[in-house]
C-alpha cells in the first residue's frame, strides 16, 4: 500500500529558491520507505534555465531574476497565476520509467483542460501541452538516484508578457497561451481541484492532502 500513496502538498505562493531548497532536502533525506509527494505551488516572477539552455534564449530580463537549475529543458518563466506541480516520485518503486511519468503528466493536463472544453494535444519530441500551436504547459524533470525532481507548469490566469523576453523552451517562434484565454472566469483553485481528480485517475493512487 505504501508505494501507492502520494502526499499532496499545497505550498501556496513561494519564491522559487525556497521551493528548490525544499526539493533538494526532500531528495537527500528520503529513503525506501518515504512516501512520494506532489507539490502544488505558484512562484513569484522568475526565469529558470534548464541544463540544455543557451544564453541566446534570454533576450532581456527586465529586472526579473534569472536562475540556473538542474532540471532538463531550456528557459521558461514562472509567475503568479501559473499552477506548478513538482513530482517527487520513486520511479523504481512504482516500476515506472521517465517516459511513462511524462505521459501521465501530459495526459493529466490534457484531461484537465478538457473539463474546460479546451482541446489540447502533445507533440513528438517536444514535451509539454499545446493548443492551436501555442504552448500552455511546460515540462522539465531531473532524475537523481531513481527519484524525480521538478515537474510541470500550467498557465492558468497570469501575465504572459515576460514570455516575450525569452525564447520559451529554446524556440524563438514559440507562443504561449493560458486557460484564461479560453475561459475568462477561470480560478486557480478550480484548476487545482480538477488536476487532483485527473492525477488520481492516471496514477491509481490515494492522494492525501497534507498542507
Swiss-Prot record:
One of its GO terms (cellular component) is cytoplasm. Residues 32-207 form the BPL/LPL catalytic domain. It is found in: Cytoplasm. Transmembrane segments: none annotated. PROSITE patterns: BPL_LPL_CATALYTIC (PS51733), LIPB (PS01313). GO terms for molecular function: lipoyl(octanoyl) transferase activity. Pfam families: LplA-B_cat (PF21948). GO terms for biological process: protein modification process. Keywords: Acyltransferase, Cytoplasm, Transferase. NCBIfam families: lipB, PRK14342.1. Belongs to the LipB family. Catalyzes the transfer of endogenously produced octanoic acid from octanoyl-acyl-carrier-protein onto the lipoyl domains of lipoate-dependent enzymes. Lipoyl-ACP can also act as a substrate although octanoyl-ACP is likely to be the physiological substrate. This is Octanoyltransferase. It comes from Buchnera aphidicola subsp. Acyrthosiphon pisum (strain APS) (Acyrthosiphon pisum symbiotic bacterium). The lineage of its organism: Bacteria, Pseudomonadati, Pseudomonadota, Gammaproteobacteria, Enterobacterales.
Amino acid at each position: 500500500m505504501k508505494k501507492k500513496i502520494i502526499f499532496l502538498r499545497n505550498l501556496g505562493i513561494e519564491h522559487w529558491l525556497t521551493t528548490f531548497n525544499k526539493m533538494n532536502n526532500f531528495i537527500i533525506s528520503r529513503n525506501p520507505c518515504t512516501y512520494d509527494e506532489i507539490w502544488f505551488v505558484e512562484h513569484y516572477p522568475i526565469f529558470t534555465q534548464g541544463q540544455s539552455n543557451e544564453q541566446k534564449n534570454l533576450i532581456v530580463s527586465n529586472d526579473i531574476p534569472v536562475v540556473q537549475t538542474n532540471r532538463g529543458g531550456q528557459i521558461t518563466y514562472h509567475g503568479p497565476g501559473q499552477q506548478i506541480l513538482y513530482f517527487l516520485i520513486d520511479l523504481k518503486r512504482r516500476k515506472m520509467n521517465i517516459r511513462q511519468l511524462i505521459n501521465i503528466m501530459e495526459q493529466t493536463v490534457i484531461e484537465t483542460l478538457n473539463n474546460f472544453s479546451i482541446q489540447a494535444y502533445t507533440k513528438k519530441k517536444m514535451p509539454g501541452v499545446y493548443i492551436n500551436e501555442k504552448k500552455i504547459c511546460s515540462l522539465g524533470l531531473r532524475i537523481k538516484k531513481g527519484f524525480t525532481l521538478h515537474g510541470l507548469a500550467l498557465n492558468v490566469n497570469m501575465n504572459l508578457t515576460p514570455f516575450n523576453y525569452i525564447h520559451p523552451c529554446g524556440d524563438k517562434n514559440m507562443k504561449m497561451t493560458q486557460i484564461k484565454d479560453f475561459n475568462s472566469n477561470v480560478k486557480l483553485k478550480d484548476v487545482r481541484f480538477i488536476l487532483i481528480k485527473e492525477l488520481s485517475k492516471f496514477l491509481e493512487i490515494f492522494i492525501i492532502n497534507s498542507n
